[in-house]
A protein has these predicted regions:
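Exported/periplasmic ABC-transporter solute-binding proteins
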Residues: 29-127, 132-312
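Short, low-complexity disordered leader/linker segments with a strong preference
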Residues: 1-45
Length: 312
């Protein structure tokens, strides 16, 4: 596992990467949340895990699979978005926060202020933030600049014809922009890396979950949206993406994430308060084992290469 110390600063969506979602920390192991409070003979240790919707499906599978390995441990997984998970961690309400973005410097400071503990981050895998259109949309590739023109406040593209796309059988080619809510790490990553931290245009369809974004795009001929690459369905098309006009366009894939050619590749994180120990450490070690990484691989995300994984 690649550990990132802070400076100032199921199988339904399975596919290839995902790494962050069900882990916790016993109160006696230096973490917050509810872990270990169930204790006692015959009772399970409960690990509370909350955060990134991108990772929630893989986290649920991890929890199920780990329950077969460690039947005395129960991992309770919930989504809500990276920001929601981190906020819960900062209050000591959960043991593990999942995030598809880096923790912000102010969040690190808030954790220390609230709990007296420094957050510990773990990169547990990689994802490509894919751009989706309806399967019948003739568009096959797009540039980051074109995406900004579509999604950013002040961007000039409001109709498909303005970027040279004509959708057969569509009279009104107004672009339906499908986005995420502001508590989402996916939203923040897209805003930073595509919009250059500009505001989004008003009038987009802002949804709670990654799956919901893809479902809406798959049911709307004129829609475009963004979500983790593991959420693709036959109803949508993943666009190739180029960093700028004239540059090569790359499909979001394991290969393009691994060789860093895809412009919107990102790391996925687990965050704990303080160093993970005891049952939590064992759970993280299991996630980074062949068994845990197989779940990641089957989830549509990019697992940590075997040579880069720590030995338990």
């Amino acid at each position: 596992m690649t550990r990132v110390p802070f400076s100032p600063l199921h199988r339904q969506a399975l596919g290839w990467l995902v790494l962050s979602s069900a882990v916790a920390v016993l109160a006696s192991c230096g973490g917050g949340g509810q872990a270990g409070r169930a204790g006692g003979q015959g009772k399970k240790t409960v690990i509370q895990n909350k955060g990134s919707d991108t990772m929630v499906n893989v986290a649920q599978v991890w929890a199920e699979e780990y329950g077969l390995v460690a039947p005395d441990v129960e991992v309770e997984v919930s989504g809500g978005g990276s920001g929601v998970g981190i906020a819960a961690l900062l209050k000591g309400a959960v043991d593990i926060a999942n995030a598809s973005r880096d923790m912000k410097p102010e969040e690190v400071r808030q954790a220390a202020k609230n709990t007296g503990k420094a957050p510990q981050g773990f990169i547990v895998g990689y994802d490509a933030l894919a751009v989706y259109v309806h399967q019948d949309n003739p568009l096959n590739e797009v540039t980051v600049e074109q995406l900004a023109q579509i999604f950013a406040e002040g961007g000039s593209a409001t109709r498909w014809s303005q970027i040279g796309v004509r959708i057969p059988g569509v009279a009104d080619d107004t672009i339906v922009r499908v986005s995420r809510q502001s508590s989402s790490g996916t939203y923040e990553f897209f805003r930073e890396h595509v919009l250059g931290n500009q505001d989004f245009k008003q009038g987009s369809r802002d949804l709670n979950g990654s799956k919901e974004v893809v479902e809406l795009v798959g049911g709307t001929l004129t829609a475009i949206g963004y979500s983790g690459m593991g959420y693709a369905t036959p109803a949508v098309k993943k666009l190739k993406l180029s960093a700028k006009a004239g540059a090569p366009a790359y499909e979001p894939s394991v290969e393009s994430v691994t060789n860093k050619t895809y412009p919107l590749a990102r790391s996925l994180h687990l965050y704990t308060l303080g160093e993970a120990q005891g049952p939590v450490r064992k759970y993280i070690d299991w996630i980074m084992s062949d068994a845990g990484q197989t779940v990641v691989q089957e989830a549509g995300y990019v697992p940590i290469p075997a040579g880069q994984r720590p030995k338990p």
